[in-house]
Swiss-Prot record:
PANTHER family: LIPOYL SYNTHASE, LIPOYL SYNTHASE, MITOCHONDRIAL. It comes from Rickettsia canadensis (strain McKiel). This is Lipoyl synthase. The keyword Nucleus does not apply. The keyword 4Fe-4S applies. Its main location: cytoplasm. Signal peptide: none annotated. Its EC number is 2.8.1.8.
Amino acid sequence: MANLNKRPDWIKVKAPNSVEYYNTKDLIKNLRLNTVCEEAACPNIGECWSKKHATMMILGSVCTRACRFCNVKTGRPDLLDPHEPQRLAEAVQKLNLKHVVITSVDRDDLEDGGALHFAECINEIRKSSPNTTVEILTPDFLRKEGAAEIIAHSKPDVFNHNVETVPSLYKTIRPGARYYNSLSLLHSIKKLSSEIFTKSGMMVGLGEKISEVIQVMDDLREAKVDFLTIGQYLQPTKDHAEVAKYVTPEEFKYLERVARTKGFLMVSASPLTRSSYHADEDFQKLKQNYRQSLVS
C-alpha cells in the first residue's frame, strides 16, 4: 500500500527564493491585500510570484464556510473594506499585470454574497488598467438572489466557479455547498452574457471514481462551461480531509484526453494544476481556441 503521507516526486516544487518573489510579497503586504496563494498554501506560489502573478483574495481573509479541503480561515468574517477595490487596482497597476485573477472567501453573511464588491473591484481595475483582462473566481452565491446578474453586468473576461469535487463527496468535503447550485450559477452567467468565458475546476485524489469525474465533465458541458481545470488534492493540515490517492501524471493525461472529447475550449489537467495557475497564458489560448472554433 502506498504511503500517502509522503508526496510523490511529481508533486514536489522548489522553495521560493527569487528577488521577484519577495518584491511581489512586499507589494501585497504594503497594500494590505490578501491572496489565495498564501491563504490556501498553494504549491505554485514560488513560480507564480516570481513572475509577478498573484491571485488576489477580496472580501476579507475569513470564510463563512468550513470546506474540508480548504486552508482558508473560517469563522466570523471581517468587516467589508470599502477601499479594497482601489488598493487592488493599485496593485494591478504596480505589478503591470496583463491579466489578473480575483477570488474571495465565501460571505454568506452579506445580502448579495459579495457580488457588488466583485463588480466594484472590476470597475476600479478597468479605470486604472483598461488593457488588463480580468478573471474572477467566485463563491457559489447560494441563495443570493440577483448576485449572478450583478456579476454578469460587470463583464469579467472570465467567470470561474469551481465545482471542486464530484457530487457524492459534497456532504463530507464541501458540506455548505450544493453541486447543482454551482452548475446553475455557471449556466446562468453564460445565459446572461454569452461573451463571458466560463471556467470551472475540480480536485481529484479525494476518493472519487473516474466515472464520476467524467460525469462532472458532462454536467459542466451541459452548463456551457468553456474551460475545465483538474488538479491533485493536497491535504493542507492534519485537520483536513486526507488524500485518498495521488493520481499519476499518466492518469491526468487520460482525463485531459477524455475532457477534450467533450467539447471544452480549454482543458488543463495535471498534478499541480490550480484554477489560476498560468491563467494569463491560458486566457490567450482560450481566446485563440474560441476563434478557431468559429471557423472549424
